[in-house]
Amino acid sequence: GILMLDEPFSALDAHLKSVLEQNLVSLFDAFHGTVLYVSHDIDEALRFCDRIAVVETGRITEMGTGDDLVNRPQSLAGVKLSGCKNATAAVRVDERSVRLPKWGIEAATSAAVPEDVKALGVRAFFLQRVDGPGENCYRVRVDRVSDSRFERTVLLGFLDRDESEAPTVSRTDDEMKYLHQHLFWRVDKLAVPADELPHEGEELWIRIPPNKVYLVSR
């Protein structure tokens, strides 16, 4: 048989959700059939599912294990649904570098760049604060910060971006374009002293590790 669940925890508070998730694990263990679980929450999908299918505009764009999706996404939809906060259009420059028009920068990559590369992704917690210029190091300004219990989410604007393909957009002109020109950086508040956390208006240097980017062609 087939058991189908469509976002069963979407309206629950965090405590109740965690309790019911454990009940659901017991149910799955006792059920001898196929479970079709629909979710927009990647962590939820990873906890419950052996294989994950990415669906975009009604079609499956990729399917694999949770590890495949998180560490080796094959499509832009997969990059985004895996929880990657930074995903942007990419143009191949050479075998080891790409141009990222919306960000107005070029970036080096450890992996070979496909001839038909479509996009680059980098997770917000992979970004590194550095002291100054270097490979994949960029001067940025902290344009916005927001705090959760244990993390600070930081919106970074590139200060020396190339505007030839995508002129800089202000927040008041077009909010979505403004956001797409920025990097999202997640800072662990438990690992960084409070007086060293990035704050709005601060200028600093950030590094995109070449070995931590995803390159996809669809």
PLM feature segments, named:
Residues 33-36, 87, 151:
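Secondary-structure boundary/capping residues
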Residues 85, 96-218:
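Non-catalytic connector elements of ABC transporters
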Residues 65, 77, 91, 139-141:
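Residues located in well-ordered beta-strands
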Residues 11, 18, 83-84, 129:
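Generic structural "secondary-structure junction" signal
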Residues 71-94, 121:
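C-terminal boundary and immediately downstream tail of ABC-type ATPase nucleotide-binding domains
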